[in-house]
A protein has these predicted regions:
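Short, hydrophobic/aromatic-rich segments at coil-to-beta transitions
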Residues: 1-3, 445-449
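Accessory DNA-engaging acidic/polar modules
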Residues: 15, 434, 439, 445-446
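Short linear proline/tyrosine/threonine-rich motifs used for host-factor recruitment
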Residues: 427, 435, 448-453, 457-460, ...
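Phosphate/dinucleotide-binding and metal-coordinating scaffold of catalytic cores
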Residues: 1-310, 314-423
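Non-Sec secretion/translocation targeting segments of pathogen effectors
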Residues: 421, 479-486
Length: 486
């Protein structure tokens, strides 16, 4: 059990983190020598100026911070990293009752996102060993499915050690690894060791073929770039025939680490896009960053990226202490628990709303927050989203997902008055009046054909075993001709 950690930034100790066993809470105290530099690593929560800098910074009670000060909790492993940590704990016969958040930070050591490091570290990445990415992907998939019940075979111990090294620090639920790829040969090594010549550092997100997850995220990446959103270069990366999504790290500038804080860390109380803009201004960011927040808001709503929680927005600080909004990341389509329909609830508020955010809400948001060219930005984003089908086809997204996502995007565009197309039709068959004829996807994946026939509401189920089902998927709900509805 670790009771005290040295917290390092760019080879300098910025302070000590200790564990109060009686209060079951951690506290951080600044190194007086570091305070003299005046570099604010947490300007809103733990400023280095004034009386607050001389008093302990106690941990947060909210679950996501695990009893740590918010600006240090960012370095903790997320859901996927915790799965790997649990396996490591079990393999090393460490009782769960003996584990504190400081143990987890010690386990992360120098491998965390951003530039903060924690000493002493339990596991070290002293050499940039070559990685068998095929074995890494196979083991990651098994652990993700079996969780703590996964049994690691003796012959897999080296792969497991590699996965612990490259996989525990990346955030999020999805299995990930931090890798470095040689620019010339394509050779893959651990991305946790600095100083590799002619290598680029990436986050590798293992794809899920059932959900076309890598292909969909790549499609969203391209649409975001076309929308004018700032993102790191990304691409698909094939491993044994399966495609995965890789993106360059924004917390690295060549061999140097950049200090990084998520919105959750830098301002724990913020839960809205209005609050995010306010944080940008408190950090004295340029107005282009505030405009970027608005552009992402519009993209997230219209593209149904509802996983817009406070850990999916970040800020980076250089060694001069200057802050900027980080490039966007984790932009993708979010489905509901049924596995087919779009999830409708956002994580961050827009004008006190998580659902049914409208064009008027966006325009008023821009007016209230001093964002210029709001309508032009909205239309730029809409133009990029109209290209979804063509881009998704190019990246071989499965037809069922193209149909579902295209329908969700079209619904949002129509509700914002950006698309005139109405997917319903009216006609007469054999003397019967058929009005408001339309097809919608149901919760468990079937399609429902709705119509009002001579004033009577009717519903017909098109199951997955029907020949029309595949045709609807291939054509897309937004593109069904009237002849097919007839």
């Amino acid at each position: 059990m670790v009771n005290t950690l040295r917290v390092m930034l760019w080879d300098e100790e910025i302070g000590r983190l200790a564990w109060d066993d009686r209060r079951r809470l951690s506290y951080f105290t600044y190194n007086p020598e570091f305070l003299k530099k005046g570099i604010d690593v947490s300007p809103l929560q733990a400023p280095v100026r004034g009386i607050r800098a001389m008093t302990p910074v106690w941990g947060e009670d909210a679950k996501m911070y695990q009893k740590l000060p918010a600006f240090l909790a960012d370095s903790l492993p997320d859901a996927w990293g915790n799965q790997l940590f649990e396996l490591w704990r079990i393999q090393n016969h460490i009782p769960n009752a003996d584990i504190t958040p400081l143990d987890k930070l010690s386990f992360i050591g120098k491998r965390g996102m951003g530039a903060l490091e924690f000493l002493p570290e339990v596991t070290k990445a002293d050499k940039a060993e070559m990685i068998d990415v095929k074995s890494l992907a196979d083991l990651a998939e098994r652990i993700f499915i079996e969780r703590e019940n996964a049994h690691i075979m003796p012959e897999e111990s080296i792969t497991m050690q590699s996965l612990l090294t490259v996989g525990t620090s990346a955030g999020g639920r999805q299995p990930k690894a931090i890798i470095a790829i040689n620019k010339t040969t394509g050779e893959v090594r651990s991305g946790q060791v600095a100083g590799l010549q002619d290598y680029d550092y990436y986050i590798l997100k293992f794809g899920d073929t059932k959900y076309s997850s890598a292909e969909i995220e790549m499609t969203y990446y391209e649409m975001a770039i076309k929308s004018g959103i700032d993102m790191m270069p990304s691409r698909l990366y094939e491993i044994d025939g399966n495609r995965n999504f890789i993106t360059k790290r924004f917390d690295r500038d060549g061999e140097r680490k950049l200090h990084t804080q998520t919105l959750a860390a830098i301002s724990p109380e913020t839960d809205s896009y209005e609050g995010l803009v306010a944080v940008c201004r408190k950090l004295h960011l340029p107005e282009t960053d505030c405009q970027e927040v608005f552009r992402r808001l519009v993209f997230n709503v219209l593209s149904n990226n509802t996983d817009d929680h406070t850990k999916n927005f970040s800020f980076v600080m250089d060694e001069a202490g200057l802050w900027r909004l980080s490039p966007a990341y984790d932009l993708t389509y979010i489905i509901d628990t049924g596995g087919y329909l779009p999830n409708t609830g956002h994580c961050m508020y827009v004008r006190s709303k998580l659902h049914h955010i409208s064009y008027d809400d966006a325009i008023l948001f821009a007016k209230d927050n001093g964002i210029r060219r709001a309508d032009a930005i909205i239309r730029e984003v809409a133009d990029s989203l109209r290209q979804f089908r063509d881009i998704a086809k190019r990246y071989a997204v499965q037809d069922r997902w193209i149909s579902s996502i295209e329908s969700a995007i079209n619904t949002h565009l129509v509700s914002w008055g950006l698309e005139d197309k109405d997917n319903s039709s009216s006609f007469e068959i054999d003397g019967k009046s058929c009005t408001d004829v339309r097809i919608e996807q149901a919760y468990k994946g079937n399609f429902h054909l709705y119509a009002s026939i001579d004033g009577r509401a009717c519903k017909f189920i098109i199951g997955k075993n029907k020949p029309e089902y595949a045709t609807i998927q291939e054509t897309g709900l937004s593109n069904l001709p009237e002849t097919m509805l007839r």
